[in-house]
């Protein structure tokens, strides 16, 4: 894990932004100022991608997908490549995490080879367990309860259009699903308001 810690610090220095916390399992892991800082950084990256082309230089990122994906997989692979890193895909659709070997063993092995792990899973508990046993950053790219990357993208859209998130009121219409849960957390963190309109018995978790 020493190599990973060193690379993690180098990436933070290159970005000019501390990469904390260690894991991103849900938006609730981030406070408001950190979210705004990430959004500002994303705008800088979009404006001058060459400046960030080696932020992940020398790093290998594991991508674990228990569920089918087009946009998430493509954006992660292309994004990691454009930042100078190397992505390795593990397609787990036919053999879910923990079925062939324990999550403990999986995490202990991945931390020896990779600088970070991004996982798209059916059960959020798998991410919690993976983060417990894997001594490199774990990123939730979708679970049954949370979708933090989608919320950061949604908030970035509002932020880019000049909206002050703390003064914004977002309406969510649909099932109270993983996207809804994360957006609620995000709006609370930045000090905004949110109204959820869902079918009866299909609202967000309490």
Task: Describe each PLM feature range.
Residues 11-74, 78, 146:
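Positively charged, low-complexity intrinsically disordered leader regions
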Residues 5-7:
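N-terminal polybasic/positive-inside topogenic patches
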């Amino acid at each position: 894990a020493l190599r990973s810690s060193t690379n993690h610090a180098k990436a933070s220095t290159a970005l000019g932004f501390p990469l904390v916390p260690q894991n991103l399992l849900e938006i609730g892991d981030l406070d408001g100022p950190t979210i705004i800082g990430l959004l500002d950084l994303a705008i800088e990256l979009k404006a001058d991608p060459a400046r960030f082309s080696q932020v992940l230089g020398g790093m290998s990122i594991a991508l674990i997908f228990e569920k089918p994906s087009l946009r998430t997989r493509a954006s992660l692979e292309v994004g990691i490549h454009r930042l100078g890193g190397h992505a390795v895909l593990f397609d787990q659709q036919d053999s879910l995490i923990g079925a062939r070997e324990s999550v403990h063993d999986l995490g202990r092995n991945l931390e020896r080879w990779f600088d970070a792990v991004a996982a798209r899973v059916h059960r959020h508990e798998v991410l919690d367990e993976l983060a417990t046993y894997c001594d490199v950053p774990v990123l939730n790219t979708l679970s049954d309860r949370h979708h933090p990357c989608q919320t950061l993208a949604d908030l970035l859209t509002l932020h880019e259009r000049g909206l002050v998130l703390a003064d914004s009121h977002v309406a969510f219409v649909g099932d109270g699903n993983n996207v809804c849960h994360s957006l609620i957390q995000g709006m609370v963190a930045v000090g905004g308001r949110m109204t959820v309109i869902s079918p009866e018995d299909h609202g967000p978790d309490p």
